[in-house]
Every structure is written in structure tokens, then in C-alpha cells.
Amino acid sequence: MEPALAEEWLEWMNEVHIPQVMATGCFREVGILKVLTNAADDEGVNYSIQYRAQSLADYERYRDQFAPALQQETKARYGEQILAFRTLLEEIRPLSPLVH
């Protein structure tokens, strides 16, 4: 997204969108990461919002019952100003401190 939009978008995500997603009960954790490495031609600001579900069934329930309306709300608010895509990941090994 354009840098001028980033602060407002992040505030909206924290105050509106993420609470709506978490209120579905489909996820147990959420994290926001700022992407520091961008493609050479990308001068925008990029974030990764990561939701963690207890099970694949919880994710599928979110995808089928809640995601369409929430995605439409985001599109109505921001239109083509942001690019959003979803990637489903399976955790193989959780983050943990390095043990010597």
C-alpha cells in the first residue's frame, strides 16, 4: 500500500477488522508483521497479518461462514488501494528459543 495510507489502515486493522475476525471464534491468536524486504519495484508498505486456528476445521468454518462478508467490507473501504491475499500454512515446528 502507499505509505500515506499505512498508518490509517493499521489503525483500522487493529481497532475494527482484527477484532471482528477474532470475534468469530475461529482463531486463537493473531500477529501483525511488517515486511521489511520488498521487490525492487515496490515502494509501498507491506504487512503480514497472521491468524492461528486450532484446527483446519476452524479455518474452513471462518472461510465459509465469515470471510466473504469481512473481505467485502475491506474491499468497500479500500478498493484497489490495498492488495490482500491469503496463504494457508501448516506449522511444522513452532517458534521457540534456541537451546544450547
Region locations from a protein language model:
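Glycine-rich beta-strand-turn "strand-cap" elements at beta-sheet edges
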Residues: 31-42, 73-100
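Intrinsically disordered, low-complexity acidic/polar segments
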Residues: 6-8, 58-60, 95-96
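Hydrophobic transmembrane alpha-helix bundles
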Residues: 20, 59-75, 99-100
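A short, structured loop/turn motif at beta-sheet edges
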Residues: 23-26, 54, 94-98
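Short amphipathic alpha-helical segments
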Residues: 5-32, 69-72
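Short, well-ordered beta-strand segments in beta-rich or mixed alpha/beta enzyme
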Residues: 33-65
